[in-house]
Every structure is written in C-alpha cells, then in structure tokens.
C-alpha cells in the first residue's frame, strides 16, 4: 500500500532489500524495467517492527512467508484479503492485491488534485506505464469524468 508495487514484485522482495534503507531498486517481473523506490520514515519503522516480530531465518529470506516457511501465492493472499473483508464487513467492492495497487494510485492522484496532470505523470512513471492515457484508464479516471458529467446537469 505504500509502494504501488505489483504483488508479484512484493512476493520477490527479501528483507535485506528493504531493511534499514531509504531506497531500494527492483526489476519488475511484468515489465522487466528497473524501478527505484523510496521508503519513508513511517514505513521504515513499520518494516523494522515487522522484522523483529517475524524474526525470519535470514535477512535474505522473503518478506512474505507462511508459517510453513513457504512463499505465499498471489491466490492465497487474495483469499486472505477476502477473509479480512468479510470478517470486518468492509464496504469495498473489490478487495484484492490488484485493487490495493489501484488504491495507491488513486490516493496519489487525489492528494495532488491541485495539479492532476503532474500527478498523472508521476503515476505513469511509478507504474511504468507507457502513456498517461494508460494510467488514466488504469485508475478509472476517464469513466469517472464521464459519469461526473451527469452530476452537473440541471433541468
């Protein structure tokens, strides 16, 4: 939720990549492109707390492993998210790994609403999209803009 990474890239992360560092780089599995990420102080603290709580076998261990020591699958994580949604009666239409990535994008966009074009350029780079049009479609902005037309109509 703090990075906008695809779940496939999160599952490949190791503790030594993210522990006690302000930045780290990955090669995205889907695109093969390099991506550098910054870890803000709040997330750095959370990572340290998780590491101390989990006490992984090695600093080179994956960050998301089951109690059996195996790396979670995307499908399993989505099942857990659905269980969380049900348990806490979350009023969310879609609650999955992918929807969390989109939520990250929408949050960045909404926080920069005074300069939405710059926000879209930033998100295009963060998501490694090839165009702003793809980023807008990914975030559902075009559809939202169309639907907002109905809100301003008066009779």
How should each PLM-predicted stretch be described?
Residues 11, 106, 135-139:
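Key DNA-contacting residues within the recognition helix of helix-turn-helix
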Residues 5, 56, 90-92, 129, ...:
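Helix N-cap/coil-helix junction residues
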Residues 1-2, 109-114:
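Short amphipathic helical patch at the helix-1/turn junction of helix-turn-helix
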Residues 92-111:
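Short basic/aromatic active-site micro-motif
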Residues 3, 7-8, 12-43:
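Conserved tyrosine-mediated DNA breakage-rejoining catalytic core shared by Y-recombinases
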Residues 28-32, 127-152:
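Catalytic-site neighborhood detector that most strongly recognizes the C-terminal catalytic loop/helix
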Residues 29-49, 60-82:
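C-terminal catalytic core of Y-nucleophile DNA break-rejoin enzymes
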